[in-house]
Amino acid sequence: MAITDYCECRFTAGNGGNGIIAWKREAHYDKGGPGGGNGGNGGNVILQADHNCDSLFFLKNKKHLFAEDGQNGKPDLAHGKNGSDLLIKVPIGTTVKNLENNSVLVDFVHDKQSFILCFGGKGGKGNAAFKSPIMRAPNLYENGDKGEILNVSLEVKYLANVGIVGFPNSGKSTLISKLSNAKPKIANYRFTTLIPVLGVVKYQNNSLVFADIPGLIENASEGSGLGHDFLRHIERCEILIHLISLDPVDNDDPCKAYLQIMDELSKYSPLLVKKKMLVVANKIDVNEGEKRFKKLEKFLQKKSISVLKISALKKELGNLLDRVFELYNKTISQFGANKFSLPMELEKHYVFQNTNENNNDPLNIEKDSLNRWIVNCKRLRYWFDKIPQTTLDNIRRLGNKIKEIGIEDQLKSVGAKKGDIIFFDGCEFVIND
């Protein structure tokens, strides 16, 4: 079965519930005052890394997921219930990007690491919340805010210290099965391994995670064969084992095989060929194995590259583990282990800017072919949605918000006069003064 390590989804947080207008009705107290409760907050969309999750298969066919809306307010000062959060569990190693600008939102590298992807809308106020010594019987209430909507991509990149790369049938699965308790499918034909296989290799009181990456073919960097599906998984590895088969059945020339794999890695990402790498010649026990090894060794010596010879099948690994752990320790002491963490400013999720505090929102006024003034303003859009125009008190409040935004002054500055028509959100208004 093919692994699902990439998907695109649309997530929508819950909308806030609406506040209501209600009045207390108590015996012997006919003027009980306002009693409309606030709406509940909408549920958030939360992503959480889980070590028991190893695929994005459960999201593959779910293109749009929703958190629960908050409930509307109720009479007798009863507030609406908050909407339930939508919790999505993802594999450790998942990177989440905003599809709109391709920016990284979060990189999950720890078990139980959580991230609020979309914030739920705040519940609207009921009329009880507007009561004051000046306004004892307010006919004011609010709609709840809309929940955030985000289109994202989720991509799993496995967290392994050592990646094993090479052509199909080079012996990668056999090698990881001999080094660890991993049980990959092994057979004498190409593309036996169809998904990355991870194995923990313990050696001299130390341990590293090895990843057997499905075999690459020519033009893998352009998507041929399994292509990009698995090249991404070695991006996180500190070091690579480049495994080359010495069996004439697997390739015509081990030197050419080396160059082809290096070329594919370079095309996919120049950073891959800059990683610390061990070149290992496998199947030294086959006919002409020694002869082909000497040819490869001589070829690589010209590039100042050493090569180890092993037989993974017979578990004749020589000093392979010595070299791997030595190179790994040297690498992390020089550069530090991969933390895969984001800069601090990216760890802090942006705040939903659908609020009246967004004072720097630009106000755009243009004249259309019908001689109407077309107004575009996010803050005005927010308050039109927030304040229902169903009571005189609400209409007055909306008028005050329009003045605060400065729309009247802006219209006058561009030449608008009494009797002109203002068009906003499908509605027409007439300037009276």
From Swiss-Prot:
GO CC, alphabetical: cytoplasm
Domain OCT: 355-433
Domain OBG-type G stretches: 160-329
Binding residue positions for GTP: 166-173, 191-195, 212-215, 282-285, 310-312
Keywords for the protein's UniProt record, in alphabetical order: Cytoplasm, GTP-binding, Hydrolase, Magnesium, Metal-binding, Nucleotide-binding
Subcellular location: Cytoplasm
Binding site for Mg(2+): S173, T193
EC number: 3.6.5.-
Intrachain S-S bonds: none
Assigned protein family: Belongs to the TRAFAC class OBG-HflX-like GTPase superfamily. OBG GTPase family.
Functional note: An essential GTPase which binds GTP, GDP and possibly (p)ppGpp with moderate affinity, with high nucleotide exchange rates and a fairly low GTP hydrolysis rate. Plays a role in control of the cell cycle, stress response, ribosome biogenesis and in those bacteria that undergo differentiation, in morphogenesis control.
Protein name: GTPase Obg
